[in-house]
Amino acid sequence: MTVLYLLEPESPGGEWAPFAGVRPIAELRAGIWRIRERWEAAAGVDVKVTWGSHAAGFSEGDEPPLRSLEPLDGPALVGASWFAPTGVPISPGHGVRRLVHRDETVGWVVPEGERWSGPHEKGPALEIDGLRLRGTFDLLTALDHLLSDDCADFLAAPGDPVPQGSLVLGDPANLVCLGATVEPGVVFDVRNGAVVVDQGSEIRNGSRLEGPAYVGPGTRVLGGFIRGSVFGPECRVRGEISSSVFFGFANKSHEGFIGHSVVGHWVNLGAGTTTSNLKNTYGQVRLEVDGERIETGRLNVGTLFGDHAKTAIGTMLPTGTVVSAGANVFGSVTPPKYIPPFAWGCTGGERMTEDGFLRIAERVMTRRAVAFSPERREALRRTFQRTIAR
């Protein structure tokens, strides 16, 4: 049986901020699904190992082990974690040694009896469909290209009837509720794409959801206008949210605009936090990451929030801001476009201590009934030490 592996970028740079060194690229969401899950769907098997050392020690409990690259024996398939397959089954024929997308190698086929020692450009290739990701900002591009089809894939699932008292604009068949609680007065606009409300989620009165959109298990939409966005598990959201992806366990329980943004795990956004997602010049957005300038090629980029980042009440974030892992954004000044890992405030260069970060993380996770196990503590401790040293 063919074994599936994923290969991380050897040394991801600023283009993958604020997640380089924090979590594997394979565990980021491209559309509804994590990149790893997309490879698993395309290959028809689960990933055995993710090869990569930049996020050594990462652990959340449901991901494959993360190890340094070493030779492997076939039969195997190795996928690049910077590529998101569309889910079309991959069936390499006899003699195929590489998977390519627009002339770029994004995977390798290792037949039985052969050994693979690392990336190469040798042998016949099979063209596959998907999206090449240049950095974290291209998770927004994934929403543009993948979300509509991701939501449409749910249409065949046996869902609940249209919730009583809700208003559906468009064909009700494009609303999929899978064991969710929906209060009367919710508006679902499915004229431009399906809306999927997954198991155990809750949509409260005063919410309007415009498809394509996905609300993950256990997530609560507390009110406001949601369009073109993805929410992973156990998020709390309110206000206006447009073309954004929330990985999971994030908290935005108050008013404020979040547009064209990526929100990592365990992020907490204070009341009124607002992102700018468009320059006054209507020019392409450039990121600034620790002195490095990165061209996104995109007109709309809001803020990229790293895991465990937090903002104070009324925080106003410029277009193309990067808030690194564990950073606490507060103060009377406009935040800079780059906020380093575990920053304490926007000025003065102060940083959180390791003990302080772990103490807050334990409080936050306990409130969501997530066990702060010794293994999780150790994983976060290693993340702190690794990112501070970068």
Predicted feature locations:
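Active-site-proximal helix/loop capping residues that flank conserved catalytic or ligand/cofactor
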Residues: R34-E37, F137, L178, P217, ...
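Glycine-rich hexapeptide-repeat left-handed beta-helix
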Residues: P12, E27, G223-F225, G232-R390
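Extended beta-solenoid/beta-helix repeat architectures
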Residues: P158-G264, K279-N280, V289, L304, ...
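Terminal amphipathic alpha-helical/low-complexity segments used for targeting or macromolecular assembly
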Residues: M1-A173, S332-K337, P341-R390
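Generic, low-specificity signal for short hydrophobic/alpha-helical stretches with a mild N-terminal bias
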Residues: P18-G21, E121-A125, V162, E183, ...
